[in-house]
Amino acid sequence: MSSMQMDPELAKQLFFEGATVVILNMPKGTEFGIDYNSWEVGPKFRGVKMIPPGIHFLYYSSVDKANPREVGPRMGFFLSLKQRGLTVLRWNAVQEEVDLSPAPEAEVEAMRANLPDLDQFLGPYPYATLKKWISLTNFISEATMEKLQPESRQICAFSDVLPVLFMKHTKDRVGQNLPLCGTECRSYQEGLARLPEMRPRAGTEIRFSELPTQMFPAGATPAEITRHSMDLSYALETVLSKQFPGNPQDVLGELQFAFVCFLLGNVYEAFEHWKRLLNLLCRSESAMGKYHALYISLISILYHQLGEIPADFFVDIVSQDNFLTSTLQVFFSSACSIAVEATLRKKAEKFQAHLTKKFRWDFTSEPEDCAPVVVELPEGIETA
């Protein structure tokens, strides 16, 4: 890790007040990063010093000793660091991952006493990118971090999965009425059906909030079903009341957490959750009047997040539809309405103009959502 030019007074303050993360025995050549910076670890690497207090994301990819070009999947973990805090971790050579088990207090204190000698082996936190990091994580509290991270605390780009049913023998497949593997598939769907159903290993999945698949209340009339399918405020209120009863703005922390897990942790499931949560927020027209402060903050969050991703990233390869433009088109049609609180409306108008200028996205066409909506009615409900 190369040193960076830093204001001497700031460097002195961070040296005495910043946190330190010591990682022992990390192999040479490992790709290691913290927040918005990553490096290839050298033989003298022992960790990072002068880290500003707060939430940080550390990540790494192990390399094959025989073939250093072979890089393993990215692993990562969040830490909430305190002023002058010291966290001591070590590399597990067998599992090829950082052991997140708390170090004994005696070892931590011994390491603290030895910090002056260890200093030359600690890389300074790259302060130049701190502002960008804060803009992407300012709603992630320690409580949000603890709530969402896996029980194992390790966030892996590829899920550690197990089969739902262990079927080692042909008779096991027959018992589940599944096609025998020796026969030829007659369709793509049949081929998919033959694949074993998998589930994440217990304790390894990110604990995102469960989002509703039914957007309307039980017993809703056909007219109510149509209304709730166009304006998702009922579904959003359900999520906020169940998952974030104390502070609705905590939903923004989850949105940022998912984005960081995708952007820096390479977790595709996190990107899918980010899309679903954003879709729920952007299509809740009635909620914008009740939670206008939340939506003002949402615009700021999206401004910073969209600055990190290429404009064509959200385009579906097959349909060529852009998820983000269609979602934001619905959002702007509501947020820029005269009925919306003035501060939110003005911020939405400026954000729309910014995106149009930067990405050349068209938000003026009639959104497809304004077309008649065909809604599948629950069993037992008949139209008049």
UniProtKB/Swiss-Prot annotation:
Q: How does it assemble?
A: Interacts with PRPF8 (via RNase H homology domain). Component of a U5 snRNP complex that contains PRPF8.
Statement: the UniProt record of this protein carries the keyword GTP-binding: no
The gene for this chain is Aar2
Q: Which domain of life is it from?
A: Eukaryota
| Free-text function comment from the UniProt entry | Component of the U5 snRNP complex that is required for spliceosome assembly and for pre-mRNA splicing.
Checking Pfam families in the record gives: AAR2 (PF05282), AAR2_1st (PF20981)
According to its UniProt entry, the protein's GO biological process terms are: mRNA processing; RNA splicing
The terms describing its cellular component in GO are:
spliceosomal complex
How is this protein named in the record? Protein AAR2 homolog
Keywords of this entry: mRNA processing, mRNA splicing, Spliceosome
What family does the entry list? Belongs to the AAR2 family.
Instruction: State whether keyword tRNA-binding applies.
Output: no
